[in-house]
From Swiss-Prot:
Influenza RNA polymerase is composed of three subunits: PB1, PB2 and PA. Interacts (via N-terminus) with PB1 (via C-terminus). Interacts with nucleoprotein NP (via N-terminus). GO terms for cellular component: host cell nucleus; virion component. Plays an essential role in transcription initiation and cap-stealing mechanism, in which cellular capped pre-mRNAs are used to generate primers for viral transcription. Recognizes and binds the 7-methylguanosine-containing cap of the target pre-RNA which is subsequently cleaved after 10-13 nucleotides by the viral protein PA. Plays a role in the initiation of the viral genome replication and modulates the activity of the ribonucleoprotein (RNP) complex. Keywords: Cap snatching, Eukaryotic host gene expression shutoff by virus, Eukaryotic host transcription shutoff by virus, Host gene expression shutoff by virus, Host nucleus, Host-virus interaction, Inhibition of host RNA polymerase II by virus, mRNA capping, mRNA processing, Viral transcription, Virion. It is found in: Virion; Host nucleus. One of its GO terms (biological process) is viral RNA genome replication. It comes from the Viruses. This is Polymerase basic protein 2.
Length: 753
């Protein structure tokens, strides 16, 4: 250009000629895309008949309106067989045209109507002017949606909106079927354009996420008003006027997952227990495993559950409650022994090599650059001093620097919930999270340069413009969360440690937050392992409910395979309620009592078996001790269960046949537990073999007393219990009489059912 401008001829061309006309014409006429829509609109509306309509409109709209203005022209639109129409026709149509039913609008535009309600009932507080530390996070921008995948939603939409279109649609998941049925009913005779309905359904069915700068709440009801609540230098307080199910699902899922991981950690086989609990838990009436498959929430406990189910999860790893994502560099791992300030030897896996990470936590974020056992630079930003300190501690421990290890005072012996020692890195973390004073004092400080937006931080966590902890700076700007939604295949071991394909540990139960929250949706844990979540009373009630629900099978096992019954995991939680010193004695006593019931005529007592069964599950001690009552620890003290008779803990009402445990209903016994008949039947039927249901060929039913007249090997129908009739045969030998009563109970039931 400089060359051209220096020569007079070209200079004249460049400065005097109008810009190339062809280029402009090309620009505005090529392609279907309108290049200047506003201008085009103004220019079109200035014409008399800017709109075209189907010919049928001539029969539906008069040629002139009340003011005598022409509404449409008789001339055809050039190049089509449509009519030219004036904007006045639209006004006429709106005022005088046919009305249509509005019943479907709230149903189709449900998400909009609900948003209006939320805003109407929301409260907007004062506006504050302050620096906003925003970090980009992946957030849900679409309140009130189900969690279907794009493909699942597509199938539902096609089925609802275009049911007659060709194309294979497979509706498999429970949620797909429910939604399809519901929507088909709602949208019968709907006159709204199908395409519009399809768009709106998509909003309702699919989670839409965006990577947005956020300073406050990240649930979808806050994100929908993001433009009203936070600017570059201001924020406006806001309380949403309603909750939406998708936020509730996310929140409840996290709570359920945390509870399950915490519980699984302390069981004999954590992985098997975790899977059993995930499969038997429901959140808001939907199976937890279905939610896990569809819900993209990333949280440590949720990701452990996903990994256990073989689902892919994010490749970032977790340490000290921060999500670490390596942004550059690489390292190899090597075992190394180090000495703490207390001369305790720790075996740590050292990362050798230069690496850079982003660290993102709930209240603080950071950029970390490190080399082998050396922190090079840490830039932190956070909501307050406390949050910034948390991030600094985690980064210092993660750096594995020698001065950090030497700052340990006292012994490291932290254990997890299952009383197992934590690994060395978590030992160090816990130690300094408790008290980081020595760590910060020993770290060292350095003078700092004045850099815009950065200040120093001293060992007592106060800001400074002159000095700072070595390598550490505080920044006004947050560090964005990792934006990629990439998911990787991972493996999980039986102690719930999750590793990527290279063997790096991404997650472990130590990383699961101990924060307790109250779930928004009802979480139903059907697994006996979760009975204790609501305390001792819940364990008591659930144990007895389980026995009553499964009484049919329990009864058979009680008489034929008691050991297997005593070992059932459903009795495990109950043991924690029995005073430690008494467990073995109680168990021995109850087992002996049960054996006598099996051996002695007429002592079979259903209610007593149900009541004492959980006590027999502990390893028994052989002792001659007798008890008239057994103690359980509930409501903060020992309460007694009477061996014979009712008590506030265990109360069976003969009249209603219902059991109440601690005043809570525990269910009804379907059979008649009247001790007499049950015992008498099994007793009287000793010496007889029960063959099956009544057989008319052997004559009318005899009463139990008439049985004694039968000869050995003779068969007869006999009336037992509540008017049931079974076919029996008198045994040919007497030797096997003892085992009869054990099988009698079972056979009677099989014959009757």
């Amino acid at each position: 250009l400089r060359d051209l401008m220096s020569q007079s001829r070209t200079r004249e061309i460049l400065t005097k000629t109008t810009v190339d006309h062809v280029a402009i014409i090309k620009k505005y006429t090529s392609g279907r895309q309108e290049k200047n829509p506003a201008l085009r609109m103004k220019w079109m509306m200035a014409m008399k008949y800017p709109i075209t309509a189907d010919k049928r409109i001539m029969g539906m709209i008069p040629e002139r309106n009340e003011q005598g203005q022409t509404l449409w022209s008789k001339t055809n639109d050039a190049g089509s067989d449509r009519v030219m129409v004036s904007p006045l026709a639209v006004t006429w149509w709106n005022r005088n045209g046919p009305t249509t039913s509005t019943v479907h609008y709230p149903k189709v535009y449900k998400t909009y109507f609900e948003k209006v309600e939320r805003l109407k009932h929301g409260t907007f507080g004062p506006v504050h002017f302050r620096n906003q530390v925003k970090i980009r996070r992946r957030v849900d921008i679409n309140p009130g949606h189900a969690d279907l995948s794009a493909k699942e939603a597509q199938d539902v939409i096609m089925e609802v909106v275009f049911p007659n279109e060709v194309g294979a649609r497979i509706l498999t998941s429970e949620s797909q079927l429910t939604i399809t049925k519901e929507k088909k009913e709602e949208l019968q005779d709907c006159k709204i354009a199908p395409l519009m309905v399809a768009y709106m359904l998509e909003r309702e069915l699919v989670r839409k996420t965006r990577f947005l700068p956020v300073a406050g709440g990240t649930s979808s009801v806050y994100i929908e008003v993001l433009h009203l609540t936070q600017g570059t230098c201001w924020e406006q307080m806001y309380t949403p006027g309603g909750e939406v199910r998708n936020d509730d699902v996310d929140q409840s899922l996290i709570i359920a997952a945390r509870n399950i991981v915490r519980r699984a950690t302390v069981s004999a086989d954590p992985l098997a227990s975790l899977l059993e609990m995930c499969h038997s838990t429901q959140i808001g009436g939907i199976r937890m495993v279905d939610i896990l498959r569809q819900n993209p929430t990333e949280e440590q406990a949720v990701d452990i559950c996903k990994a256990a189910m073989g689902l892919r999860i994010s490749s970032s790893f977790s340490f000290g409650g921060f999500t670490f994502k390596r942004t550059s560099g690489s390292s190899v791992k090597r075992e190394e022994e180090v000495l703490t300030g207390n001369l305790q030897t720790l075996k740590i896996r050292v990362h050798e090599g230069y690496e850079e990470f982003t660290m993102v936590g709930r209240r603080a974020t950071a950029i970390l650059r490190k080399a082998t056992r050396r922190l090079i630079q840490l830039i932190v930003s956070g909501r307050d001093e406390q949050s910034i300190a948390e991030a600094i501690i985690v980064a210092m421990v993660f750096s594995q620097e020698d001065c950090m290890i030497k700052a340990v005072r006292g012994d490291l012996n932290f254990v997890n919930r299952a009383n197992q020692r934590l690994n060395p890195m978590h030992q160090l973390l816990r130690h300094f999270q408790k008290d980081a004073k020595v760590l910060f004092q020993n770290w060292g400080i350095e003078p700092i340069d004045n850099v815009m937006g950065m200040i120093g931080i001293l060992p007592d966590m106060t800001p400074s413009t002159e000095m700072s902890l070595r390598g550490v700076r505080v920044s006004k700007m947050g560090v964005d969360e990792y934006s990629s939604t990439e998911r990787v295949v991972v493996s999980i071991d039986r102690f719930l440690r999750v590793r990527d394909q290279r063997g790096n540990v991404l997650l472990s139960p130590e990383e699961v937050s101990e924060t307790q929250g109250t779930e928004k949706l009802t979480i139903t844990y059907s697994s006996s392992m979760m009975w204790e979540i609501n305390g001792p009373e819940s364990v008591l009630v659930n144990t007895y409910q389980w026995i009553i629900r499964n009484w049919e099978t329990v009864k058979i096992q009680w008489s034929q395979d008691p050991t297997m019954l005593y070992n059932k995991m459903e009795f495990e939680p109950f043991q924690s309620l029995v005073p430690k010193a008494a467990r073995g004695q109680y168990s021995g006593f109850v087992r002996t009592l049960f054996q006598q019931m099996r051996d002695v005529l007429g002592t079979f007592d259903t209610v007593q078996i149900i009541k004492l069964l959980p006590f027999a599950a502990a390893p028994p001690e052989q002792s001659r001790m007798q008890f008239s009552s057994l103690t359980v620890n509930v409501r903060g003290s020992g309460m007694r269960i009477l061996v014979r008779g009712n008590s506030p803990v265990f109360n069976y009402n003969k009249a209603t046949k219902r059991l109440t445990v601690l005043g809570k209903d525990a269910g009804a016994l379907t059979e008649d537990p009247d001790e007499g008949t049950a015992g008498v039947e099994s007793a009287v039927l000793r010496g007889f073999l029960i063959l099956g249901k009544e057989d008319k060929r052997y004559g009318p039913a005899l009463s139990i007393n008439e049985l004694s007249n039968l000869a050995k090997g003779e068969k007869a129908n006999v009336l037992i219990g509540q008017g049931d009739v079974v076919l029996v045969m008198k045994r040919k030998r007497d030797s096997s009489i003892l085992t009869d009563s054990q099988t009698a109970t079972k056979r009677i039931r099989m014959a009757i059912n």
